[in-house]
Amino acid sequence: MEPTFSLIVAIAAVTICITAFAIYTAFGPPSKDLQDPYEMHED
C-alpha cells in the first residue's frame, strides 16, 4: 500500500469518527445535558 493512500484513509477515518461523535453528542443521550442559552435568557 502506498503511503499517500494510507494517509488519505487515516484522515478519512478521523473525520468520520469526529462527525459520528458530534452527531452522537447532539442527538444521543448526552444531548439531555446540553443547554440552550436562548431558552434560558429572560427578556
Swiss-Prot record:
Membrane topology type: Single-pass membrane protein
Subcellular location per the Swiss-Prot or TrEMBL entry: Cellular thylakoid membrane
Family annotation (Pfam families): PsbN
Tell me where the transmembrane regions lie. Answer: 7-27
- The reply to whether Oxidoreductase figures as a keyword in the UniProt entry is no
Cysteines engaged in disulfide bonds, as pairs: none
* Assigned GO CC terms: plasma membrane-derived thylakoid membrane
Q: Name one GO biological process term.
A: photosynthesis
UniProt keywords, alphabetically? Membrane, Thylakoid, Transmembrane, Transmembrane helix
Q: Where is the signal peptide?
A: none
Q: Which InterPro entries does the record match to this protein?
A: PSII_PsbN
Purpose of the protein: May play a role in photosystem I and II biogenesis.
The text of the family note is: Belongs to the PsbN family.
Recorded hits in NCBIfam families, A to Z, give:
PRK13183.1
What name does UniProt use for this protein?
Protein PsbN
Q: Which organism is this entry from?
A: Synechococcus sp. (strain JA-2-3B'a(2-13))
